[in-house]
Amino acid sequence: IMIEGDANGRGFQYPIPTYSITKNFDWSETENNKLLFEMTAKYGTPYFSNYINSDMEPSDVRSMCCRLRLDLRELRKKSGGFFGSGESTGSVGVVTINMPRIAYLSKDESEFFHRLDKLMDISARSLKIKRNVISKLLEAGLYPYTKRYLGTFNNHFSTIGLVGMNEACLNAAWIRKDLTQEEAQQFTIKVLNHMRSRLSDYQELYGDLYNLEATPAESTTYRLAKHDVKKYPGIITAAKEGQAPFYTNSSHLPVGYTDDVFSALDIQDELQTLYTSGTVFHAFLGQKLPDWKSAATLVRKIAENYKLPYYTISPTYSVCQEHGYIAGEHFTCPKCGRASEVYSRITGYYRPVQNWNDGKTSEFKQRKVYDVAHSVLHEGRMNKEEKAEVKGNCQDKPTKNLLFTRKTCPNCKTSKILLDKAGIKYVAIDAEEQKDVTLKYGVTNAPTLLVPTGSGYEVYDNVSKIKKYVEDQKN
């Protein structure tokens, strides 16, 4: 059904499935793979999570409610991307910071960071106020369904994002270069790390989760640029002369930079991994890939050679009312000459280009699509060290099985039942009340089971791993 599209050949806007690419992903010619990658090649529907080289774990998408908050400066990843959020998590709100305006108004780098800090302080405080208000409303019974199924906003993030880092570098008097240049890239890395540090400060100050997001900014890129051009006629935007103004999303490259997907990935890989949520690389293609194998090969190459957490394969396609699906960009049907709809991805969703706002339309006109057939992957760019199975090697290793739990964790109860039914003895540790023991063994999730071995101890840090351990003991 997803491959056929609707009655007119349009791809379905929803659902937007997120597929996890792990080291154990089966790349063989199965029927499921043919369907998945044919859908990817034709409509670009799915998102892909990179669990091969990124710093994410497959269990992360389910583990937010069980994470232990022992280090208030730890910036956690908001897993699942835009469309696959983990259980019991989300954002209470998002504030997007206008980076080009800060750069334009700053005479030097020091003033830039001073202005950025001021805006981040205001953003963090406003998000704290919003969190307090909606939490009071939740407790007062105004969100009965949320209260029943979610219970609390404690695992929700206060999100701060940015827009237009490419144009910020162009407007910065001390740089005057775009993100294709090394100097601008290094400044961007410095800015993102600085923002991460400030977010850790806010976590300590307010006691809430904060994260740094590459916000989609579907309309914000146009709205902020439009207001800036009106107020500051000399400010540089991403638009060409005569076009509606817009800013480049987050720290993305100029949309017309290259048609080599791997050249773009080489630069974006280092930048996108500094965000803790919302970041995604869209591989914009001019048209449908030739077959499902081509799509599978590209998805695999990206996962195995880059660290970025989320990406899409995004071909452009057109739809004629009479003749249905047409590969590529055709504003008039090549068969009947009638006007047709051109579909491309706009910050996550496929929408007809004719319906985009003026700023995003300018972006589409400038966008250089990737030529996969002539893109060159630089071999050996990743140091592919196999991660060993996590094992503790503490001098004071436990003499008995230790199960770290939390009172409000449903998976902790499940783990106890599994161990009890199997007759496996253990000592239950309340991870929050016995924090010294928890810190001693570096436990960050609940439930976590520590099993002593000859050289140290094995770590099973979620209910799935504990269940697998129990099954192995039975065999």
Locations of regions flagged by a protein language model:
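Conserved catalytic cores of very large enzyme subunits
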Residues: I1-N154, I175, Q181-K335, V342
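Conserved phosphate/anionic-ligand binding catalytic regions in large, soluble enzymes, centered on
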Residues: S88, T152-C169, R338-N355
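Intrinsic, low-complexity terminal and presequence regions
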Residues: T316-K335, E341, R345-P398, K421
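Local sequence-structure signature of Cys/Sec-based thiol-disulfide redox active-site neighborhoods
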Residues: V390-I424
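Thiol-based oxidoreductase modules, predominantly thioredoxin-like and allied folds used
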Residues: T405, G423-D436, N445
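Short amphipathic alpha-helix with an adjacent loop that forms part of the alpha/beta core around
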Residues: V437-G442, V470-Q473
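Structural micro-motif
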Residues: Y441-L450
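Non-catalytic, surface beta->alpha helical segment in thiol-disulfide oxidoreductase systems
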Residues: V451-N475
